[in-house]
A protein has these predicted regions:
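A Lys-centered signature of the CheY-like receiver
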Residues: 100
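Active-site residues of response regulator receiver
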Residues: 56
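Short amphipathic alpha-helix used as the core "switch/output" element in two-component signaling
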Residues: 43, 62-76
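Non-catalytic signal-transmission and effector/linker regions of two-component phosphorelay proteins
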Residues: 1-9, 39-42, 69, 103-118
Length: 118
């Protein structure tokens, strides 16, 4: 049986950045689901079981630590993104860390690497 494209859940409260991520990942062959809040992200994870979650560390001022821990416990690969300096402190807790602003090519390359490892 043939597997479809790897599903990536983009959890980002900035609609413009969410769109940039979606377009670049879809053009690179990934299937993409989106969430703008932690509640939407939890629902999407339960409904769609993504292979990888791209998680904004600070969603509308809310830290995503709890969701990160839930995803890691479930064995889901997590790429953290953040525009704040504290994102590097999470390197041991996430599968990958991407500091904003990032280049679309960096997003796609990191996503490919994590998808290949899962």
């Amino acid at each position: 049986m043939e597997r479809g494209p790897t599903l990536v859940l983009v959890v980002e409260d900035d609609p413009a950045l969410r769109l940039v991520c979606r377009v670049n990942l879809e053009l690179s062959g990934f299937a993409v689901a989106e969430a703008a809040t932690l509640d939407e992200a939890r629902s999407a994870v339960a409904a769609e079981s993504p292979a990888l979650v791209l998680l904004d560390l600070h969603l509308g001022g809310t830290a995503a630590d709890e969701l990160l821990d839930e995803l890691r416990a479930a064995g889901t690969a997590v790429m953290l993104v953040s525009g704040t300096a504290d994102v590097r402190a999470y390197e041991g807790r996430a599968s990958a860390v991407l500091a904003k602003p990032f280049e679309p090519a960096e997003l796609v390359e990191t996503t490919r690497r994590l998808a290949a490892a899962s």
